[in-house]
Amino acid sequence: MAKIGENVPLLIDKAVDFMASSQAFREYLNKTPPRDYVPSEVPSESTPIYLQRLEYYRRLYRPKEERG
C-alpha cells in the first residue's frame, strides 16, 4: 500500500509541466508576451524543470515556417 504523500513530487512535476505548457500556448496565441518569469507557485527546486519545459513547449507550439 502506498504511503500518504508518496506521489506528491510526481504531482508537483506534472503541475509544473502543465504551467509551462499553458504559458507557451498563451504566447503562441499572442495572449501574453514571451517571458522567462517563473510563477511564484513553482517551488524553487522545480524552477529548472519549469524553464526547460517552457522552452520545449515554445519550440513545439512555434508555427512551422514555409520553405520557398
UniProtKB/Swiss-Prot annotation:
One example of a Gene Ontology biological process annotation: DNA replication
SUPFAM superfamilies per UniProt: DNA polymerase III theta subunit-like
GO molecular function annotation: DNA binding; DNA-directed DNA polymerase activity
Name the record gives this protein: Uncharacterized protein YibT
